[in-house]
Amino acid sequence: MKQAIREKVKKKRRREKNTSGKYKGLYILFRLAADDFTYSAFFYLSKRSKEEHTTSAANLHPRKKKRMPPRRAEKNKAPNHHPSFFLRVIPATFVLPDNILIILCSDSDLFFVAEAIS
């Protein structure tokens, strides 16, 4: 199941690449569990740091020599520039009319409103 979700995200990411080469936005996929009508959510924050790209490439080809990127002076980054991570979802999901969901995330007081993918 997780592999299928990852494949969907990969396809979507390839499709929605913008001109700067960074990936856009936040992908939210929902799966409806038919037995108890609860939603499980998969959050993927698609902005990835350059270091993460280089380390993942090095892990894929362990025999290749890892080429380190040139060191640059640290700039003042905005607080929302994070590498990829998964948000944990607390069991507080409210189903609204027309398949609109509000999902409260345990990492902050923020909530996401999104349409469920059937």
Curated annotation (Swiss-Prot):
Region (Disordered): 49-80
Comp. bias (Basic residues): 61-70
Domain of life: Eukaryota
Name of this chain's protein: Putative uncharacterized protein YIL032C
